[in-house]
Amino acid sequence: MTYLPTPCRVRDLPGCTLLTLPPEIDLSNATTVFDAVAGAVHARGDRLAMLVLDLTGTRFMDSQGARLVDDVRRLLGPRVPLRVAASPSGVPRRVLELTGVRRDVPVYDDASQARSA
């Protein structure tokens, strides 16, 4: 796991908040990444209209990453839509498919598609 001082980059865009997640998500950092995502969600409160998790730069993700996405979905509840951007040929997309998370969270090829869908 590569040490990153900031577990994710947060950008507020028109109509959504975009979080770019780290290059690797596994047991060593999944809790820290979730805490950062939850902090961004709570900081925006009722202003949060949609959340996009950008996994296009994530090269490695195990089942902890899938659990993170599912935990974020449950944190948001039905009020705030969650969308995920993941490269079609990347590991994160495959993990989301194999774990069944993709049935509950829409996955798009890139962040632009996720924002506009």
Predicted features and spans:
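STAS-typified acidic loop motif
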Residues: 2-38, 57
